[in-house]
Amino acid sequence: MTSPSDVMIDIDQLWSIFGQGEQAFAVHQDLNLQVHRGEMLSIVGGSGTGQTVVLRPSLGLLQPGKGRVTTLGRPAAELCRAGASARVGMLFQHGALYSAFSVLDNIAFALREQGGLPDAVVRQAAMIKLQMVGLKPEHASRNPADLSGGMIKRVALARALIMDPPLLLLDEPTAGLDPTSSDEFCALLRQLQADLGLTVVMVTHDLDTLFALSSRVAVLAEKRVLVSGTAQEVAQFDHPFTTTFFQGERGRRAMAPAPSATPLAAPASA
């Protein structure tokens, strides 16, 4: 049985409603989902199922039309209060860096906004996070326009971690990255999750990322969580979306075991 203290996010009977009156429509109806301490949960679903929308009430950015959302043991709406949001890190799909700020100032932004710390301490903390995500000290003075897509992701990740949050939310973390950069970013996320004891919730459409990172997968369909379990378990669930998503060519390729290296033949004797 899961202890209440081990439930990082508790979504209970959530209705996500947009519009008003006759124009109102529900993206989610009676959606239930719990996120447990230490797991890496991926949320997947077809077009229009509102995967990213699920993250918004968890951050207190969207008031549920109905239902209840608790994050880190308190009503999620309270995260909008001063200081409370520092306990949840958010990595947006395209990084969302401030173009007029240097890399260092982007990373340090939330810490500076909180106030109360000498600038030297803020800069040191930002430099630690910069190197934690695999960037070099000389990158600190660069502007976002001078960075590659992979570097932007790393800076955004460092910014999300600057307040040492126990909970990290990721929106399409490997979108726009080439396969090598995607693999490297996944390896970085795995290492940070292990080193920092993070709980991670991720929205992704990338099957390679899903299989590389997820300890559990929740599938959204029919305005609710249709099924959750390991990637291998949900891949076998009988539903049109899971069949198309997991059993198509991309899914089969992502689930295929990595080929073992062929040993080199011993050199022939002279």
Task: Enumerate the language-model features and the residues they cover.
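Conserved ABC ATPase "signature" region
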Residues: A120-E138
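Helix-to-loop junction immediately C-terminal to a conserved catalytic motif
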Residues: L59
